[in-house]
Amino acid sequence: MDLGSSYLPGELQAAYLYGQLEKVEEIKESRMKTWRFFYENLSELSANGKLELPIIPAECISNAHMFYVKLPDIGVRTKVLEYLKNNGIGAVFHYIPLHSAPAGIRLGAFVGKDKFTTSESERLIRLPIWYGMTDIERATVVDAVVEAVNACC
């Protein structure tokens, strides 16, 4: 972002969004199916303390826009991401905290104690999830995550 920049959607983006809005329930249900599959099939790793699964508060409704897992630390996260990449799974770390991003370092300052921001960001992995994901693709992702985590932890 810089001076004079405009981030309003153009006509092409609006047309693309409109097509998605017309099928919003179908898209959401497809993504929810994948989300539930991941959650159910990774629950054993969670029960064994090898990773943490997403928490959706009771008063909230998920649209399944992403599925993440939290691993014990950045070392395990790095190994799991490498394993997934080597096995054709496009998983990524979730975010870089603003205070440690280049612009944050240059322009900002962290206020208070960094009790959670950095450590939590170093544990998160986002798994691939998309509309129309097949049962085979879902199982491939889960199998690779299980293999990677069991090899590391």
What feature does the model see in each segment?
Residues 1-153:
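PLP-dependent aminotransferase class I/II
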